[in-house]
Amino acid sequence: MLTEILSRESCAKCRVCCVFDRDDVWEIPVVLPETADYIKKNIDKNAELEPYEDGYRFVMHFKDSEELTYCPMLTDKGCVLGDKKPFDCKVWPFRVNRINDNILGITVSPVCETVSALPVSKLSSFINKKYNEHGSLADIMLDYANKHPYTIKPYVDDYPVLKVVTNK
């Protein structure tokens, strides 16, 4: 989905999107129930998933506040979930954030240095360009957020806003 602005090679070398510290708990992707079932049946029957709203999140174990913990689905070859990876992961470093009660924003995480180094105008054009029969990446993200509102992340001040919409 993002290969126009981020090569698979650059993405695979970095993996910063798959590592978390205690301050990143809000960024842990939400796994839909059907994906959680798939993980338990096909990948790791002992995978630790905790209920989160209408979905699940991976349980991350931190020994101290400085420790980094990798997503349990990350291997040397990348994400074992492939096409079944959480929506948050499919569209990262883009996010739907709640700016206030009535406003949602599509933002880009500055943690992804490759993408966030691109001009905001290029990123804005990218997310608003028709992607497939479902519309632009922005349309797809907002549709998903409307269907799964618990996946909307809180707004973080240093995340550049690429699109603003009124919350339905």
What is the meaning of each model-derived region?
Residues 1-168:
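Short loop/turn segments that flank or connect secondary-structure elements
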